[in-house]
């Protein structure tokens, strides 16, 4: 899958007017989202010997494992770190329907949007943590994305903030004390080789950017911010 995207930041004071404007633009009420993401990394770094005449390098990537638990309130949120103290919690957490993603670096060069290759799959049944451990991966860290989502044509518009576990209260708290919101507008294209669909997605995002101009400035972040490779 190839994901075409643009990003912006808005202050907490701008949220209400942005939600109102997006509801008017899309013709829908915002959907509340709450996503729990865990990042797993290889337990050992793999450094293959590159023989003379062999080009390229073999990179190892972190795996992002995401579960949509928007129907749960904060009291029901189960942290991987906390769940290790409870067999029931770790079992319930491991057997949720997790979505796996390996994300490559976005394309380099002068681009109108961020274009990133993503390999994704889901584990609908069974222990996802045992599966990851069988791949020689280990848990690294976790976070939660809370916010709102709209759909406009083929584009998904998300306004979210990152939360992390508060070790004192055992609830989740905002990571960024400035309380800013991250806006992500994206379109998923099935295949990198589908040039027509990719071009159409880029044009559609450019249209969204123009329509939201004055409300927010959608742009391309530094591609290094997307680097999930093991160094």
Curated annotation (Swiss-Prot):
<feature type="coiled-coil region">
    <location>
        <begin position="191"/>
        <end position="218"/>
    </location>
</feature>
<dbReference type="GO" id="GO:0003712">
    <property type="term" value="F:transcription coregulator activity"/>
</dbReference>
<dbReference type="GO" id="GO:0016592">
    <property type="term" value="C:mediator complex"/>
</dbReference>
<protein>
    <recommendedName>
        <fullName>Mediator of RNA polymerase II transcription subunit 18</fullName>
    </recommendedName>
</protein>
<dbReference type="GO" id="GO:0070847">
    <property type="term" value="C:core mediator complex"/>
</dbReference>
<dbReference type="GO" id="GO:0060261">
    <property type="term" value="P:positive regulation of transcription initiation by RNA polymerase II"/>
</dbReference>
<dbReference type="InterPro" id="IPR019095">
    <property type="entry name" value="Mediator_Med18"/>
</dbReference>
<comment type="subunit">
    <text>Component of the Mediator complex.</text>
</comment>
<keyword id="KW-0805">Transcription regulation</keyword>
<dbReference type="Pfam" id="PF09637">
    <property type="entry name" value="Med18"/>
</dbReference>
<keyword id="KW-0539">Nucleus</keyword>
<keyword id="KW-0010">Activator</keyword>
<comment type="similarity">
    <text>Belongs to the Mediator complex subunit 18 family.</text>
</comment>
<keyword id="KW-0804">Transcription</keyword>
<comment type="function">
    <text>Component of the Mediator complex, a coactivator involved in the regulated transcription of nearly all RNA polymerase II-dependent genes. Mediator functions as a bridge to convey information from gene-specific regulatory proteins to the basal RNA polymerase II transcription machinery. Mediator is recruited to promoters by direct interactions with regulatory proteins and serves as a scaffold for the assembly of a functional preinitiation complex with RNA polymerase II and the general transcription factors.</text>
</comment>
<keyword id="KW-0175">Coiled coil</keyword>
């Amino acid at each position: 899958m190839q994901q075409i995207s643009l990003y912006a930041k808005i202050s907490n004071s701008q949220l209400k007017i942005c939600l109102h404007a997006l509801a008017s633009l899309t013709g829908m009420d915002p959907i509340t989202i709450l996503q729990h993401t865990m990042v797993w990394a290889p337990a050992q770094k793999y450094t293959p010997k590159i023989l003379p005449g062999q080009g390229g390098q073999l990179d190892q990537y972190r795996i992002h494992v995401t579960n949509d638990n928007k129907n749960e309130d904060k009291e029901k949120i189960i942290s991987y770190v906390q769940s290790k103290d409870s067999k029931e919690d770790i079992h319930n957490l491991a057997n949720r329907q997790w979505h796996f993603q390996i994300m490559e670096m976005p394309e380099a060069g002068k681009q109108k949007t961020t274009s990133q290759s993503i390999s994704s799959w889901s584990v609908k049944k069974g222990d996802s943590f045992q599966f990851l451990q069988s791949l020689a991966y280990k848990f690294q860290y976790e976070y939660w994305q809370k916010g709102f989502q709209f759909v406009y044509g083929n584009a998904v518009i998300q306004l979210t903030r990152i939360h992390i576990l508060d070790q004192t209260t055992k609830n989740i708290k905002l990571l960024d004390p400035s309380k800013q919101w991250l806006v992500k507008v994206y379109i998923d294209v099935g295949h990198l080789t589908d040039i027509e669909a990719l071009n159409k997605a880029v044009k559609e995002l450019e249209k969204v950017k123009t329509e939201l101009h004055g409300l927010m400035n959608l742009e391309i972040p530094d591609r290094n911010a997307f680097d999930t490779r093991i160094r």
